[in-house]
Amino acid sequence: MSETTTFNKSFILIGLIALFVIPELNNVHYDPQPQFWAEMTVAWAILGLFSFILWRSRERICIPFVVLPLGLLALYLCLQPLILANIDFPGLNYVSALELLLCIFLAISISTIKNTYGLRYMLTSLSYALLIGAILQTLIGFIQYTGTTSYFGDMIFYDSSHPTTNIFGHFGQRNHYAHYLSWGTFGLIYLYQQRRLSAKLFYPLLLWMSFSLTISASRSVFIYFAIALIFSGSFYFNKRNHESKRLFCLIACATIALFAFEYFYPLIHKLFTAHNNFSSGLGRIDSESGTGRRGVEWDKAWLVFKSYPIFGYGWNGYAKQSVLLHPLFPNAALNSGLFTNCHNLILQLLAETGLIGAGIVIFGIIYAIYRLLRRSASVESVILLCMIGTTLSHSLNEYPLWYMYFLAGLVTFLAMDKPLAIIGVNKLRALATIPIIACAYLMVSGSIIFDTLVNYYDTPDDQATFTKQAKYLQNIVDHNPLWAYFAIYTLDNYINVDSDTTNKLYSLPTQYYYTHKLNTFHPYPDTMTKEAMLDWKLGNHDAAIAMVKLDLIAFPVYKSSFKDTLKDPQYKELYQLVK
């Protein structure tokens, strides 16, 4: 890069904070895509960091290996709609491909920084960013835990309807919160290992992080720290030097602290809050089997893969198959919502992208990890393995990599291997300028569209405004593939069967067309009922009956809601099915 090293390093740290701290602090969660603004912030941070690296570098840019699987998967997702006829919303393939393109930009940026200033500098800067972010999230989590969110107005995101599961920072999910705090804890350990923090600061912070992980009530943290113990223990027994011993002891200390807080949590709980609704990860392990519902979804994903082994059923196509296959599992736990993801990265990829997509990802990750370790394991590579292990083990039980802020983290970790290639900066500038401008344009225009979708999500009362907004949404569904799904998700609110405002705007066949289009992609319980009602009114009685029966089998917890929706005498036969 340029000669002004101090300026470069300061901007790089700011860039990492913009990437790993600011998006995660987002407290705005609006339908039709609650994490939109957090993910958009990640995208802008990546674009800014890549542009800075590209135009501050004097000579060479480094290309890490992880760029290859990212590029191949992006290409395959773009080609999949041409190969498979059953992809209802190809724009979602293109959006994911654009996200992977941004990840390529990020990987190149991280590799170039690491190759310029060294792995230790890169990981130190990353650890500072993750620690800052984790501390801020724990403060938010503590406010949620103590029930004092009312003092902060809308600044703190809070779900008052779930008093035992709302300790999730600004992630909205406790396992995502614990995942991020685990990254921060490993960053804290690395900074102390490198003597960047004093013992007076390290140990109180370690205890605070352990407490925060405990009140999140995530069971996955035990897996994360068990994996970290295995990695650091193997490193110590292979090296048997002071550095490896110190790292192993620190991770063991963190693990013991976590178990201590988990075990004594019922006593600690009384110090901070008066309510008796509490749980911890250890308590949840003792009281729940935990994987029963996920196991059914894993079985479904495997069945989908067996039916579509090469190309997969189609990107984002699992949700439909999950509902259609549900009758095969009569003893499954009750579903309170639609599973759009089977909660396992490998099975999800096998089901939706087949051996081609899954092979690209699995081989890419394994070989990237191998490249991190193939010369000689170091403290830095072990810390990176701990962070990677956290993300991958979480991905075997949920879907964190479907969020840009976690995907960006994994790409960052994997991009710290030895560069696969080094190219002249002028060549990359020529190649990247148009994609950068195109991404920026799509991000600006997409933000405007999303803001409009949020404003239009709740239907207005007057017919003129209702018609205007519905026509806007309909136009996006019909002509903007990148936003068609989110627009039809919003338009669904405007299609209310037997409503005068809807009937004045759309004929029954038109109502059916858009309801069916959404329902064949993401069969939500209320949308299935709506399609059944429209089928009935159009004279397709057998289809209506079949749809209600499937709805009842897949979502029995909503039986009372179905009865309320179908109580009109004209749907008497459908109503009888849910009595």
Predicted regions and their residues:
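Hydrophobic transmembrane alpha-helices and their immediate junctions
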Residues: L355-I383, M547
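Transmembrane signal-anchor hairpin modules in multi-pass inner-membrane enzymes, especially those
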Residues: M1-V95, L101-L131, L191-K200, E243-R246, ...
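Short aromatic-rich membrane-water interface segments that cap or initiate transmembrane helices
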Residues: H29-D31, I87-E99, S161-N175, I285-G290, ...
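A membrane-periplasm/extracellular boundary helix in multi-pass inner-membrane enzymes
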Residues: K239-I285, T433-T452
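TPR repeat positional signature
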Residues: A487-T490, M528
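Transmembrane alpha-helices of multi-pass inner-membrane enzymes
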Residues: A228-I230, V379-L431
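TM-adjacent membrane-interface loops and short helices in multi-pass inner/ER membrane proteins
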Residues: Q173, G295-F339, T353-I360
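Alpha-helical transmembrane segments of multi-pass inner-membrane proteins
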Residues: F11-N26, V42-I53, A74, C78-P81, ...
